[in-house]
Amino acid sequence: NGMAVAEFLESHPKVAYVNYCGLESSPYHALAEKYLPNGSCGVVSFGLAGGREAASIFMKNLKLAAIETHVADARTCCLNPASSTHRQMNDEQLKAAGVPAELVRMSCGLESSEDLIADIAQALDKI
C-alpha cells in the first residue's frame, strides 16, 4: 500500500514532495533496492503545497485514516506534526527543528490501496 499511495501522491499537483524510498525519484532508492529487496514499509511522508493550512484541511477531511500521534498500526494512521505533536511551534521554529509545516506522515495500513487512494484524493480535493 505504501508504494501505491506514494506513486499517487507523487503525481498529484497539490503535493509538493514525497519521501518514500521505494520511489525511483528518491535519493535513497538504490539503497532501498539493496537492503529491502522485498519492498519498503508503509510509511510515507509528504508535503502539501499550501503549507500548514493545506495540511490542516487535508487532515480534517480524511475519512478512512485515523488521526494519530503514532504511525504504527494495522489501520492507516496519519499525522501532521505542525498541528499535533509540534503545535506549540510557529513556522520559523518548525523550520529550525527540521519539521516543515506542510509535512504529513502516513502509515498505510491493511485497507485496500484503492480505498486509501480514494480517501486521499477526496481530502486533497478539499484544499
Residue positions per predicted region:
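PLP-dependent enzyme catalytic core of the Aspartate aminotransferase-like
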Residues: 60, 76-127
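Conserved small-domain helix->loop->beta segment predominantly found in fold-type I
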Residues: 3-63, 69-74, 89-95
